[in-house]
């Protein structure tokens, strides 16, 4: 059992746990200090806001009738499971892929917790250009998923030594 945690990609799972804790702590702070629908101006291009997203990225399917909550929850569980199995089969030294998978798992579980507990995801990071364009509000879990996805793509471009 210990070799599974130290000799495989699962040794990187600490990063998923860190992403989950950071995400949930940030969301809790936002929910306690900023009323829903309100925000705090931090810089001319960045606000902290308290908004809900019942859909996925960019509020995809947010207007659906509630079934999307369970669809996205199921996807998060399946994807996290598949990536955890891949990490268990990978050597610990495959650092970029294991790093990427851990970030995706952490982000997926962070948003899964919101969907199960609240019925929606709490978003709070709001970047904008003047008042002309607001990027969709997002959270720490979304950042972890996005960074993980970028690392997965980068890992695909890295030449691997042939198996002998």
Curated annotation (Swiss-Prot):
Keyword Membrane assigned: yes
Main location: membrane
Transmembrane domains' residue ranges: 2-22, 40-60, 70-90, 99-119, 138-158
GO biological process, one term: proteolysis
Record HAMAP family: LspA (MF_00161)
Record keywords: Aspartyl protease, Cell inner membrane, Cell membrane, Hydrolase, Membrane, Protease, Transmembrane, Transmembrane helix
Family to which the UniProt record says this protein belongs: Belongs to the peptidase A8 family.
Active site: 123, 142
Record EC number: 3.4.23.36
Record organism: Tolumonas auensis (strain DSM 9187 / NBRC 110442 / TA 4)
Protein localization: Cell inner membrane
Record's protein name: Lipoprotein signal peptidase
GO cellular component: a single term: plasma membrane
């Amino acid at each position: 059992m210990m070799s599974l945690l130290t000799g495989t990609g699962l040794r990187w799972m600490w990063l998923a746990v860190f992403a989950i804790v950071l995400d949930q702590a940030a969301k809790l702070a936002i929910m306690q200090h900023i009323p829903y629908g309100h925000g705090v101006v931090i810089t001319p291009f960045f606000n902290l806001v308290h908004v809900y997203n019942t859909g996925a990225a960019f509020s995809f399917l947010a207007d659906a009738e509630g079934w999307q909550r369970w669809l996205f929850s199921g996807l998060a569980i399946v994807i996290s499971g598949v990536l955890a199995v891949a990490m268990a089969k990978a050597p610990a030294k495959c650092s970029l892929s294991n790093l990427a998978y851990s970030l995706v798992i952490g982000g997926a579980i962070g948003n899964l917790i919101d969907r199960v507990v609240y019925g929606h995801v709490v978003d709070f990071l709001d970047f904008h250009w003047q008042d002309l364009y607001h990027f969709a509000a997002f959270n720490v879990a979304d950042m972890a998923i996005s960074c993980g996805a970028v690392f997965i793509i980068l890992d695909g471009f890295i030449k691997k030594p042939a198996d002998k």
